[in-house]
């Protein structure tokens, strides 16, 4: 196996651990559970599977995952707040395995979310799928952002300009940065 194949395999395994962490936590997402407890469960799962949590102590962050509840866009800090019926929750997990990072997140609904919340979840998922569908050699990163922004704005939502997607590998946040907006408008 060449060096690139080895790196890709390590990234795949780290990504699989991060994804498995989200699979594990799914059954726990119910009203009454604190975001601190979600953090503890995810931390233990990652550790028990040979990994480490990348966010823990990263730039002073004192939790092992991010829990963004309702109006928190991203990088929410787990705490004593308990989940309530109707909440929407994004859990962002970054696992380190064999010195490589796997970074993913998933949106959860707690009980019965509002129609507006479900619309937001559906539109963001659709924009992700549309942006993945256009990927092929020769496409530019700006094409991805354009696809996302166009779809989101047609549904009367807006994109977050202060954060972006990023590459993974043997560094937590690395190139390329993938903006969620059209570079035509910058």
For each predicted feature, which ranges?
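Active-site neighborhoods and metal-handling regions in enzymes and metal-associated proteins
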Residues: 1-184
């Amino acid at each position: 196996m060449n060096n690139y194949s080895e790196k890709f395999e390590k990234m795949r395994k780290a990504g699989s651990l991060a994804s498995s962490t989200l699979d594990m936590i799914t059954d726990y997402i119910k009203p009454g559970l604190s975001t601190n407890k979600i953090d503890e469960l995810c931390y233990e799962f990652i550790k028990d599977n040979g990994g480490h949590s990348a966010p823990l102590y990263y730039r002073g962050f004192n939790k092992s995952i991010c829990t963004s509840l309702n109006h928190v866009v991203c990088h929410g800090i787990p705490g004593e707040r308990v989940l309530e019926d109707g909440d929407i929750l994004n859990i962002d997990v970054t696992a380190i395995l064999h010195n490589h990072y796997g970074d993913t997140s998933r949106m959860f609904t707690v009980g019965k979310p509002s129609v507006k919340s479900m619309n937001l979840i559906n539109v963001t998922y659709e924009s992700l799928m549309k942006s993945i569908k256009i990927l092929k050699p020769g496409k530019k990163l700006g094409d991805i952002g354009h696809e996302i922004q166009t779809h989101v704005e047609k549904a009367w939502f807006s994109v977050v300009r202060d954060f972006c997607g990023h590459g993974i590998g043997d560094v937590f946040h690395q190139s390329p940065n993938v903006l969620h907006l059209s570079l035509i408008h910058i």
